[in-house]
Amino acid sequence: MNYLNLPKIDLHCHLDGSVRPQSVIDIALQQNITLPSNDLSEIQSLMVAPDTCLNLDEYLTRFELPLSVMQTAAGIERIAFEVFEDAAIENVKYLEVRFAPLLHLQSGLTLQQVIGSAVKGMKRAEAQHDIKGNFILSIIRNMPKDRVNEVIDAGASFINNGVVAFDLAGSELPGFCEGFIPHAKYAVEKGYRVTIHAGEQGVGQNVHDAIAMLGAERIGHGIGINAHKQAYELTKSESVALETCPTSNVQTKAVDSLSSHPFREFYKDGVLITINTDNRTVSNTTMTDEVRKVMQEFDLSREEYFEIYKVSVEHSFASDAVKQQLLALAE
């Protein structure tokens, strides 16, 4: 099977984890930023996580270098354009990219400028390539909560014009949802959809709480539900889709190996699952790689792939018109 030619949807992709290493060097030179090295292979080694990390926190260290060149409007716009371009080249037809605007304020940009620059880059890619997209605004859970509503307000003017959803990301501690109930409610009032990173590190209760307390329509990763009956049943009964990221889940030790990933069990039992990259650079992956790995490891047919593709379309935060275009590509 030609996996490259299959139409694909990626609903869980981090902007700062999907930066071209060469672009880090280029932007650093333009902006007089000192890097540890200007050697491409060395920069790449600092941006790509090991095949297996000690834990999620070690994996997250790979974001420091790209963030250093994502503090200006030009840098953010270029990197946004390039992630959509890279995805389009491998037949990703719709891409939702997430990033945390609060991490891009070190050189004086406003939150609105940060978000606007990313949207501008995406729209340039949409004009040049056969791809549609949207942004999801992430809040890093261990940062102070006093600016969360500022992010929501800054993104509100872009709702359904480049921005579609609110997310909580970063290190996962048990019981984090309770502290964000007012923020999720405020985001929904402002027109945001909701997807939450939960159950990535095995805490199934977090998935339950993200759905019950925060109104999550999708869950980032979510594999912790396999050991939490209530979360599993709620995920199914509420038709909440899981954004599974197989390569990343192995790297962060969320699962021991791809073969032990609960993907197939979820799929066979009617849990709504999707296939995603998480971080194209940090995980050294593409959607083509993810689809190939999943189809081969779990022996999925072409028909089964398109069933999963349709789940991705239906549970995307795309407009109805874009969804119709995407569904028409399913064979």
From Swiss-Prot:
Keywords: Hydrolase, Metal-binding, Nucleotide metabolism, Zinc. GO terms for biological process: adenosine catabolic process; hypoxanthine salvage; inosine biosynthetic process; nucleotide metabolic process; purine ribonucleoside monophosphate biosynthetic process. Catalyzes the hydrolytic deamination of adenosine and 2-deoxyadenosine. HAMAP family: A_deaminase (MF_00540). It comes from the Bacteria. One of its GO terms (cellular component) is cytosol. The record marks 221 as: Important for catalytic activity. SUPFAM superfamilies: Metallo-dependent hydrolases (SSF51556). It comes from Shewanella piezotolerans (strain WP3 / JCM 13877). Belongs to the metallo-dependent hydrolases superfamily. Adenosine and AMP deaminases family. Adenosine deaminase subfamily. Pfam families: A_deaminase (PF00962). InterPro entries: A_deaminase, A_deaminase_dom, Ado/ade_deaminase, Metal_Hydrolase. The lineage of its organism: Bacteria, Pseudomonadati, Pseudomonadota, Gammaproteobacteria, Alteromonadales. GO terms for molecular function: 2'-deoxyadenosine deaminase activity; adenosine deaminase activity; zinc ion binding. Binds 1 zinc ion per subunit. It catalyses: adenosine + H2O + H(+) = inosine + NH4(+); 2'-deoxyadenosine + H2O + H(+) = 2'-deoxyinosine + NH4(+). Its cofactor is Zn(2+). The active site is at residue 200. This is Adenosine deaminase. Zn(2+) binds at residues 12, 14, 197, 278. Its EC number is 3.5.4.4.
